[in-house]
């Protein structure tokens, strides 16, 4: 898979997350999507994961994913990010830092490994990328 194709996939995936474009889930997630998480490994479908995202967004209103670094190579992608949202009861800002890598198959997400820091964590970067696939805001 080319870097351009991978970038296009994650541009669509960002629309799913930030613009609630759940109609794009079938273009982003394969027939099965294996997720390796702190609670263990599980396999979901695009449809079930879209429903899960909707529930998560209810629990974390206005959630945004600020990406600080990413790498695309072959059929893999890696991101360093922070979830940002407001506590639904207090309205106070909440954060949670994490890293996630993906395996892509037939142009769609097939498998992911995600590691999250505790709630309240955030990366020390002053500025995030403009979009998930934009160049980092610092010179290499």
Where are these regions (language model features)?
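A beta-strand edge to alpha-helix "cap/lid" segment located at domain peripheries
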Residues: 5, 9, 50-140
């Amino acid at each position: 898979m080319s870097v351009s194709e991978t970038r296009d996939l994650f541009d669509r995936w960002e629309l799913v997350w930030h613009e609630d474009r759940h109609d794009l889930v079938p273009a982003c997630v394969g027939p099965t999507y294996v997720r390796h998480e702190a609670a263990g490994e599980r396999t979901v479908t695009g449809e079930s994961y879209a429903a899960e995202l909707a529930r998560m967004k209810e629990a974390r209103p206005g959630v945004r994913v600020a990406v600080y670094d990413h790498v695309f190579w072959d059929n893999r992608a890696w991101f360093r990010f922070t979830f940002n949202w407001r506590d639904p009861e207090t309205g106070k800002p909440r954060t949670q830092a994490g890293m996630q890598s993906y395996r892509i198959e037939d142009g769609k997400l097939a498998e992911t490994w995600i590691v999250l820091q505790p709630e309240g964590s955030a990366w020390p970067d002053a500025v995030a990328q403009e979009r998930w696939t934009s160049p980092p805001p610092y010179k290499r």
